[in-house]
């Protein structure tokens, strides 16, 4: 006979973001699972002191086992932390591992368990933190005592009834524990909701129906209540949290690598690995891995992520209720799909599996769990994503040549993705960039994406942008962010571009004091206005507020024609009204050309057109190949030497 499940522990079957650790307590319940928090100590520290005013309180979540208390409270904890509000989640199972490890399951011990938790929660709240307590706490008397402990010290106590029905909770009963099943079979005695009563709150401040509403909706209801009570700051900066998919615990990494030896594998292409890097570092927050069909359809048809539910349910069908617990406060722009194509043969080998090792060049980089395989429908995809299915478009060809199926699922990344090409020092994650900007005391960050060498016209635009930002900010910082993933064969290679950018900074054409050079890991798609939304949206993860959009961004020549495939002004126009990007200040690209009178790059002046010369990329490449130099003031001399050397080497090799 198993010991009784502690009535104050949480056994939610809603998805967790980290692998749980299992109890090794001797003489205590074996039904206690340690719940890992979803935010790090560093993230907690970043929230301290960001807002004035006291907002300490305890939010007490009560409900049946499996109702969703821990899932909601931890999602709320992450959201509050993102908003700069210090908070901490107390979970019933976690408390049983420490503070209350000496307590059993008699009525007296259960009362003492709640009393201790209430006293600890009061201290957290009294320190100015928002304490989130997730406990079944089935008895009204115990919850009233917890309230009195707070209110006797004039500390706010907010009771939240997670009112998920017993039927739904039993449906969620997670394997391998299957606590409800065991309780029904008489293997667990005193289990709340089965043979022990649950007394619903009579006057809870908030009631959540987590059987009907998603995690994000529940979190929003709690936030709305906090706002109505003046417990949220009036001005909240819109700086979304970053969702990294790296496994941070070395022991867990070792366990996953050992497990991978017995798992089916999928061999990644280099482009697949680049997309895995994008996901792992958090550029595609809130995605937890390669898209499932639901998110794929949202991206392809709406250009947005509307939710993080796992399955698509037809009208009238019952959903499986699986939903990622990452908080989504609003729809998120996601104009391009992030997917993992697989072949027919690979699909056959994955039938019925629940976990898959993702490898590149024989090395395990990630474990994909809860997989979903769905049809790629490549022709439909390229027509929607690129506006053409012409295989002469290099990225269209790449899609058409890929697998007929897409593999979606959550990924746990077991190692940092590096390419050992001498450029890894420039591959900064969003969180690393945020730390750099904080160290530089940036009060504004503006980004400039490019896949070409920098001439002085580009630099003029960046300097001019900073001058304008200085009217409202003290220290705006430039994120010079060249695209570092796959590009078409005739583009300048990444290593040459980085050397050229280094030379521009070394000559102080761009001031190193306010310029941060970093590589953006995304592959290029040449999808025009569709892709430029991704380029802007992904940089929000790094903490930018301003984005410079160029002429014909992510554009390409129409196959078989000298014309551009996409209308050259549409990228900027689309960004100005794209859904989910309203918090991002879009800075239009001012046209710069070579001013023959001033002998420098200047903004084009229509009143003296004859004084300006447009030095095209074709002309620039011709000058470099022939060993000629461009006009004075077109490009920093050492930067030109890098570029000329590259084109000269191409000519020699040919």
Curated annotation (Swiss-Prot):
It comes from the Eukaryota. SUPFAM superfamilies: Nucleotidylyl transferase, P-loop containing nucleoside triphosphate hydrolases, PUA domain-like. Pfam families: APS_kinase, ATP-sulfurylase, PUA_2. It is found in: Nucleus. Residues 1-26 are annotated as: Disordered. NCBIfam families: apsK, PRK03846.1. Residues 242-653 are annotated as: Sulfate adenylyltransferase. ATP 1 binds at residues 66-71, 218. HAMAP family: Adenylyl_sulf_kinase. ATP 2 binds at residues 449-452, 550-554, 592. In the N-terminal section; belongs to the APS kinase family. In the C-terminal section; belongs to the sulfate adenylyltransferase family. GO terms for cellular component: nucleus. Its EC number is 2.7.7.4, 2.7.1.25. Residues 1-231 are annotated as: Adenylyl-sulfate kinase. This is Bifunctional 3'-phosphoadenosine 5'-phosphosulfate synthase pps-1. One of its GO terms (biological process) is sulfate assimilation. The gene is pps-1. Disruption phenotype: Lethal phenotype. Embryos hatch, initiate growth and development, but arrest at the L2 or L3 larval stages. Abnormal cuticle. RNAi-mediated knockdown causes a 42% decrease in 3'-phosphoadenosine 5'-phosphosulfate (PAPS) synthesis activity. Reduced sulfation of disaccharides of heparan sulfate (HS) proteoglycans. Defects in cell shape of epidermis and patterning of body wall muscle cells. Some phenotypes only observed when grown at 25 degrees Celsius; such as shortened malformed tail, exacerbated molting defects, blistering, and sterility. It comes from Caenorhabditis elegans. The lineage of its organism: Eukaryota, Metazoa, Ecdysozoa, Nematoda, Chromadorea.
């Amino acid at each position: 006979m198993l010991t009784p499940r502690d009535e104050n522990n949480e056994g939610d079957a809603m998805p967790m973001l980290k692998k749980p650790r299992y109890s090794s307590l001797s003489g205590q319940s074996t039904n206690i699972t340690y719940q890992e928090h979803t935010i790090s100590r560093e993230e907690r520290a970043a929230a301290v002191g960001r807002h004035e005013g006291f907002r300490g309180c305890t939010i007490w979540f009560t409900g049946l086992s499996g109702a969703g208390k821990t899932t909601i409270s931890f999602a709320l904890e992450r959201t509050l932390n993102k908003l700069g509000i210090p908070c901490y989640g107390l979970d019933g199972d976690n408390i049983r591992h420490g503070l209350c490890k000496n307590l059993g399951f008699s009525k007296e011990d259960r009362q003492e368990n709640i009393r201790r938790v209430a006293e600890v929660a009061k201290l957290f709240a009294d320190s100015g933190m928002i304490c989130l307590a997730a406990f079944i706490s089935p008895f009204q008397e115990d919850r009233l005592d917890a309230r009195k402990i707070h209110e006797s010290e004039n500390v706010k106590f907010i009771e939240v009834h997670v009112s998920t029905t017993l039927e739904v909770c039993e449906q969620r009963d997670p394997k391998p524990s299957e606590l409800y099943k065991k309780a029904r079979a008489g293997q667990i005695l005193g289990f709340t909701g089965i043979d022990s009563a649950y007394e619903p709150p009579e006057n809870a401040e908030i009631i959540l129906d987590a059987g009907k509403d998603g995690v994000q909706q529940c979190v929003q209801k709690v936030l709305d209540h906090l706002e109505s009570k003046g417990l949220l700051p009036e001005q909240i900066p819109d700086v979304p949290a970053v969702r990294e998919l790296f496994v941070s615990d070395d022991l867990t990494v070792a366990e996953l690598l050992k497990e991978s030896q017995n798992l089916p594998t999928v061999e990644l292409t280099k482009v697949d690995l680049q997309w895995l890097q994008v996901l792992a570092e958090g550029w595609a927050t809130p995605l937890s891995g390669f898209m499932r069909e639901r998110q794929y359809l949202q991206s392809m048809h709406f250009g947005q992520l509307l939710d993080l539910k796992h399955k698509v349910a037809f009208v009238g069908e019952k959903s499986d209720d699986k939903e990622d617990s990452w908080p989504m406060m609003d729809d998120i722009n996601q104009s391009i799909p992030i997917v993992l194509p697989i072949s027919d043969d690979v699909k056959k080998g994955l039938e019925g599996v629940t976990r898959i090792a993702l490898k590149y060049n024989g090395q395990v980089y990630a474990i994909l769990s809860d997989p979903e395989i769905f049809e790629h429908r490549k022709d439909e995809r390229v027509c929607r994503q690129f506006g053409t299915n012409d295989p002469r478009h290099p990225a269209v060809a790449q899609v058409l040549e890929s697998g007929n199926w897409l593999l979606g699922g959550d990924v746990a990344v077991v190692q940092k993705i590096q390419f050992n090409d001498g450029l890894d020092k420039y591959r900064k994650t969003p969180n690393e960039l945020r730390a750099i900007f904080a160290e530089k005391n940036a009060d504004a960050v503006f980004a400039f994406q490019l896949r070409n060498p920098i001439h002085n016209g580009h630099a003029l635009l960046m300097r001019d942008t900073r001058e304008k930002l200085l009217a409202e900010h003290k220290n705006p910082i430039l994120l010079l962010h060249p695209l570092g993933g796959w590009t078409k064969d005739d583009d300048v290679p990444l290593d040459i571009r980085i050397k050229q950018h280094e030379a521009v900074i070394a000559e102080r054409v761009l001031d190193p004091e306010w310029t941060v050079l970093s590589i953006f890991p995304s592959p290029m798609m040449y999808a025009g206005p569709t892709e430029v939304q991704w380029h802007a949206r992904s940089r929000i993860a790094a903490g930018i507020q301003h984005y410079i959009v160029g002429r014909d961004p992510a554009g390409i020549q129409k196959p078989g024609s000298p014309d551009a495939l996409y209308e050259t002004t549409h990228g900027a126009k689309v960004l100005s009204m794209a859904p989910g990007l309203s918090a991002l200040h879009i800075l239009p690209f001012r046209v710069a050309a070579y001013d023959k009178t001033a002998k420098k790059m200047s903004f084009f002046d229509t009143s003296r057109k004859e004084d300006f010369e447009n030095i095209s990329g074709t002309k620039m490449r011709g000058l470099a190949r022939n060993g000629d130099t461009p006009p004075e003031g077109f490009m920093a001399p050492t930067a030109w030497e890098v570029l000329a050397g590259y084109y000269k080497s191409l000519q020699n090799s040919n």
